[in-house]
Amino acid sequence: NERRHRLHEVVRLSGMNIIIDDDDYPLIIKVASLPGMRLQVYFLDNEEFFKRKFMFHDEEGKPFADNEDRMVFFCKGVIETIRKFGWPADYIHCFGWMTALIPFYLKTAYKNDPILNKFKIIYTPYKEDISGFFTPKFLDKASINNLEPEDLKPFMKNKDVTLIEGALAFTDGIIIGSEDLDESVTKAIKKLKGIPVLDYVPLENMKKEYMEFYNKLIEE
């Protein structure tokens, strides 16, 4: 509810555009306050990409044809918003396939940024993954800031797009988000060397386990 949570546009950040495949898309940043908590939540918006009745699939359950573009827009938009605010942070925690490009971008396109190159990156994979509906054209769309499609090789396997496995290759820590993961993802995690992994944690234990994991990772 926009009125209840006082959701409104951050006007001073308006005017930013995200380029995808040579097309410009305006990035609208909104903020809301959670009742009873001293916490603000920021939202990235674009009417063409996100003003829909369903999130990732249409009413027949078919993934939207522009999910590739929406993902690139979201991932780059998150990073550019952090840069715009100048937020220093100890870590950034990315959840699911929709954020899979963020660890990659932070370790490549933005690796020399003085604000972003100090983050510890944590990635949480889930069972849900729509990589199978992505096309090789995704590599061109995701090649931002002088990156080349070849730089995204970790996101390809046997000519198929593998979003989650790609993200895992650029993370500093992993927290499993589902009790059951795809076998290929489980194998990819086991192959990683020196990356701390927190197995799936039930909701009632999540706060304690996650904080311990965060603190241990930051101290390393």
Label each region the model flagged.
Residues 1-220:
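Catalytic cores of nucleotide-sugar-dependent glycosyltransferases that transfer UDP/GDP/TDP-activated
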